[in-house]
Amino acid sequence: LIALDLDTPVVALESTVITHGLPRPQNLQLARDMEKAVREAGATPATVALLEGKIHIGLSDGELVRLADSESTLKVSHRDFATAIVKKADGGTTVAGTMYAANMAGIKVFATGGIGGVHKESAFDISTDLRSLAEIPTIVVCAGAKAILDLPATLEYLETMGVPVVGYQTDEFPA
């Protein structure tokens, strides 16, 4: 990514919102809007995805269209990279997957709508996003955890794992 070589600010963006989060054509519009918002804030957007089994950090508009239009993309978390690469698959990266790839590329800031967390009334369903937040040295800017989750348990898990949670203009853990 040229922006990293020039020592300019770079913000990583996930791609599962494009591949699995929203229907067409809203998914493509959101991808373009996210990149536009990063540019307007003075940084370079770097949407992370897999294309033909290769990790891409920063996508062209044509690549965004390809992801948005595809019905066969994989959902790629941290644990799924090896399988997706071997299959030469296209894939949208989750929060954990994006953090992993961005960190390997030297990107330290990542923005997303919402992180995963501890699921309600579940035997033991905890998103790998939380472990990644504890282990990968990346600043994650988000609107909070997804509203369908057990927010108090998610916040407790983050505290237990030593993840600082900082709210901007709020005293609550937002969803």
For each of these PLM feature ranges, what is it?
Residues 2-6, 10-11, 40, 100-104, ...:
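Solvent-exposed alpha-helices and their adjacent loops that cap or buttress functional pockets
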Residues 9-11, 15, 32-36, 159-167:
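Internal alpha/beta core interface subdomains
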Residues 11-13, 45-50, 91, 109-114, ...:
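General beta-strand structural signal in soluble alpha/beta enzymes
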Residues 15, 20-22, 28-85:
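Glycine-rich nucleotide/cofactor/substrate-binding loop typically near the N-terminus or early
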Residues 25-30, 63-68, 117-134, 157:
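A glycine- and small-aliphatic-rich helix-loop capping segment at beta-alpha/alpha-beta transitions
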Residues 25-32, 89-97:
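Glycine-rich anion/phosphate-binding loops
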Residues 46, 51-52, 57, 130-175:
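A structural signal for small-residue-enriched, beta-sheet-centric alpha/beta enzyme cores
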Residues 91-118, 144-156, 161-163:
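Internal active-site segments that recognize and position negatively charged phosphoryl groups
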